[in-house]
Amino acid sequence: MPHNGFDIAAPALAIAYHSGFGHTAVLADAVAAGAREAGGVVSVIAVDRMTDADWDILDGADCIVFGSATYMGNVSAGFQAFAEKTGQRCHNGTWRDKVAAGFTNSGAKSGDKVQTLVSLAVFAAQHHMHWVNLGLGAGWNSSRGSENDLNRLGFWLGAGAQTDVDADPDQVHPSDVRTCRHLGWRVALVTRQLNVGRAVTPAASSPAASSAPTR
């Protein structure tokens, strides 16, 4: 019998981000808004101000979406400091099999920010999490396109945004805000799908490593 998932609890998502000047914080709120539209219960957490309660939220979430400004072609020092505090959780498998995704913002159109998304994905992989890509085609790549297209900068691993270095946080490009909102919606939907699968298939409800072959 098909399972519609309505009897499954709403997925719990946490948006864990670092923002140096407020632009990435705007994108974090957009991801959260999209996740709520898809029925998620969302917490937004600035990782440079972590409390014990924040760590508990991350540990209990079904999904964590990571976000960082791109500085010098990689995640910010603030995000990296947070990542390095998760070492024991990585060792213990605390976040194993949670869903993950990522987003970033830079001052330049490219800014080498794909490296930031790669770093976020590798961080998630080290925690044995399931990475969700952006799920959008490229925008602004034809004569009929414009900078107002979703995914205007053409990223697939996660959401990539660009904000002028002298712009205020309320001047983050509307297309980038909508792209991050899409990411939140998509990752919440995937998380719900995974939760439904775990509910109806006992084999899917246990950590993947528990049934892994030994050599």
Residue ranges and their predicted role:
Residues 73-77, 97, 105, 134, ...:
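Generic structural "secondary-structure junction" signal
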Residues 34, 77, 112, 132, ...:
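Glycine-centered flexibility motif
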Residues 21-23, 68, 74, 112, ...:
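Gly/Ser/Thr-rich helix-start
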Residues 103-105, 163-169:
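Short, local alpha-helical segments
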Residues 146-163:
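Short glycine/proline-rich, acidic loop/turn segments that cap or connect secondary-structure elements
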Residues 99-151:
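Short, glycine-/small-residue-rich phosphate/pyrophosphate-handling segment
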Residues 1-95, 166-215:
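N-terminal beta1-alpha1-beta2 submodule of the flavodoxin-like/Rossmannoid cofactor-binding fold
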